[in-house]
Amino acid sequence: MTISAPPIIDIRQAGLESSIPDQVVEGLTKEVKTLPALLFYSTKGIQHWNRHSHAADFYPRHEELCILKAEASKMAASIAQDSLVIDMGSASMDKVILLLEALEEQKKSITYYALDLSYSELASNFQAIPVDRFHYVRFAALHGTFDDGLHWLQNAPDIRNRPRCILLFGLTIGNFSRDNAASFLRNIAQSALSTSPTQSSIIVSLDSCKLPTKILRAYTADGVVPFALASLSYANSLFHPKGDRKIFNEEDWYFHSEWNHALGRHEASLITQSKDIQLGAPLETVIVRRDEKIRFGCSYKYDKAERDQLFHSAGLEDAAVWTAPDCDVAFYQLRLRLN
């Protein structure tokens, strides 16, 4: 019997790649220069990130795996029958498969949707799933952004009344500023949890580590430099599809990593190797000084007070916590605060 591949549903509302150049121009013409996160998640960028996240020193992934191996059955027990399980940024499947296997073992009839920006990565990840081993868990994929996924959840008529479990693994919420993280969680709660609030939840991983040596080892581990530099070649291809010109010469740039103690976050930037750099068209008026950073990513760490503030600001409460000894990472099940 031939098992058909899970469907990949295109839920993109607008031309994503056409909006990235506008974000690049906006970020590089500000006083404090930045690059948009979407620039780093091309197909090649995702492949480099997966390599980086598998490095021995990249503790967040290893700690998530450790917790899931021990606690997946308890997590699965907390997910309602007939739920939609939406993985917001699926990337590598090696973590979530532990939860899906636990759901299958408990005979939970659920539909798992992997959401990702890269069609080819979705197709590749699903090829690696032994779908013939699953009888209760059904698989599908959503090709689009976070916003596309939330819009789909609100508007697809055939799923409107089913319980939802939103997965935010991989410390995804740490990539947002603290205020934006609360807004993002609040938006998910209002979009995805309100139709069945007592049976729906968000499962999110957060990191409480604020030890600079451990953090800097993790975020400079193997694979991170090509991940960072792949964004520049992707930008060149978006602005100049024919390949006849460049905004960035990749060999002019370094990856820079630092811990910001005051803000409780790791900061990732690109810096010039040794000199001032004039960018190419259409940004030829932009000069990046040799001591200037172009920030592209932050990873916020959360102590207990910061977690409590995050959940409260988002209108959520933690219903369960799963962690393991010696782990700074933990998973939190969040539900709408009803009082």
Curated annotation (Swiss-Prot):
Pfam families xref list: Methyltransf_33 (PF10017)
What practical use does it have?
Ergot alkaloids are known for their toxic effects on humans who consume contaminated grains or livestock that graze on grasses harboring ergot alkaloid-producing fungi. Due to their strong affinity for monoamine neurotransmitter receptors they may also have clinical uses such as treatment of migraines, Parkinson's disease and cerebrovascular insufficiency.
Question: What's the EC number here?
Answer: 2.1.1.261
Q: Which reaction does it catalyse?
A: 4-(3-methylbut-2-enyl)-L-tryptophan + S-adenosyl-L-methionine = 4-(3-methylbut-2-enyl)-L-abrine + S-adenosyl-L-homocysteine + H(+)
What Gene3D superfamilies does the annotation carry? Vaccinia Virus protein VP39 (3.40.50.150)
Note whether S-adenosyl-L-methionine occurs among the keywords.
yes
Q: Which UniProt keywords apply?
A: Alkaloid metabolism, Methyltransferase, S-adenosyl-L-methionine, Transferase
Question: Which family, according to UniProt?
Answer: Belongs to the methyltransferase superfamily.
Pathway the protein takes part in: Alkaloid biosynthesis; ergot alkaloid biosynthesis
* BP-aspect Gene Ontology terms: ergot alkaloid biosynthetic process; fumigaclavine C biosynthetic process; methylation
The species this protein was found in: Aspergillus fumigatus (strain ATCC MYA-4609 / CBS 101355 / FGSC A1100 / Af293)
Disulfide bond residue pairs: none
**InterPro entries linked to this entry:** EgtD_Methyltrsf_superfamily (IPR051128), MeTrfase_dom (IPR019257), MeTrfase_EgtD-like (IPR017804), SAM-dependent_MTases_sf (IPR029063), SAM_MeTrfase_EasF-type_put (IPR017805)
Tell me the organism's taxonomic lineage: Eukaryota, Fungi, Dikarya, Ascomycota, Pezizomycotina
* Record bears the keyword Cytoplasm: no
Q: Name one GO molecular function term.
A: protein homodimerization activity
According to UniProt, the name of this protein is: 4-dimethylallyltryptophan N-methyltransferase easF
Physiological role: 4-dimethylallyltryptophan N-methyltransferase; part of the gene cluster that mediates the biosynthesis of fumiclavanine C, a fungal ergot alkaloid. DmaW catalyzes the first step of ergot alkaloid biosynthesis by condensing dimethylallyl diphosphate (DMAP) and tryptophan to form 4-dimethylallyl-L-tryptophan. The second step is catalyzed by the methyltransferase easF that methylates 4-dimethylallyl-L-tryptophan in the presence of S-adenosyl-L-methionine, resulting in the formation of 4-dimethylallyl-L-abrine.
**Could you describe the subunit structure of this protein?**
Homodimer.
Induction of its expression: The expression of the ergot alkaloid synthesis cluster which leads to the synthesis of fumigaclavines is positively regulated by the brlA and stuA transcription factors.
